[in-house]
């Protein structure tokens, strides 16, 4: 199973790239984890936000292909580390690749939300999108370590 993190935004601070890549490289070869960045629509004082969301959403869904789609969204379901490990196993047993979607400043398009089979909430707080990339990478690596009996996660 391959996991894709599809995120709106291409100009992230260096610490985001470093943090994401630190966990990305730890994933096993049979579970590659890749980041796909979607160029954010141009926002300005008179920007048509609905149109921008639609364009970003279309690009995200195209990148997903036939993968299982999981959105990252505040109203989604929150999981403990053990529950995330169970989700990871369930996704693996499903036999499909998984695309996790992180929206831009205004969130995800209605089309992305409608296409999602699951929605995952990291927190009821609004988190900066660059930080979410690193938190998701670490959380998934920790969940994988539980399923593989790797010593990374400690109770």
UniProtKB/Swiss-Prot annotation:
Positions contributing to S-adenosyl-L-methionine binding: 72, 103, 122-127
Subcellular location: Cytoplasm
Signal peptide as annotated in the record: none
Broadest EC class assigned to this enzyme: transferase
EC number: 2.1.1.177
Quaternary assembly: Homodimer.
Name by which UniProt lists this protein: Ribosomal RNA large subunit methyltransferase H
Source species of the chain: Actinobacillus succinogenes (strain ATCC 55618 / DSM 22257 / CCUG 43843 / 130Z)
Gene that encodes it: rlmH
């Amino acid at each position: 199973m391959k996991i894709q993190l599809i995120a709106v935004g291409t100009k992230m601070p260096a610490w985001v790239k470093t943090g994401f890549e630190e966990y990305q490289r730890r994933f096993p070869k049979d579970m590659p984890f890749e980041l796909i960045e979607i160029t954010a629509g141009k926002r300005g004082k008179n920007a048509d936000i609905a149109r921008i969301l639609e364009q970003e959403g279309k690009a995200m869904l195209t990148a997903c292909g036939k993968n299982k789609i999981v959105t990252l969204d505040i109203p989604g379901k929150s999981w403990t580390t053990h529950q995330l490990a169970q989700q990871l196993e369930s996704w693996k047993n499903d036999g499909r690749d998984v695309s996790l979607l992180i929206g831009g400043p205004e969130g995800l398009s209605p089309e992305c939300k409608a296409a999602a089979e699951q929605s995952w909430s990291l927190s009821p707080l609004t988190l900066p999108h660059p930080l979410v990339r690193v938190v998701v990478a670490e959380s998934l690596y920790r969940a994988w370590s539980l399923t593989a009996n790797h010593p990374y996660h400690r109770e």
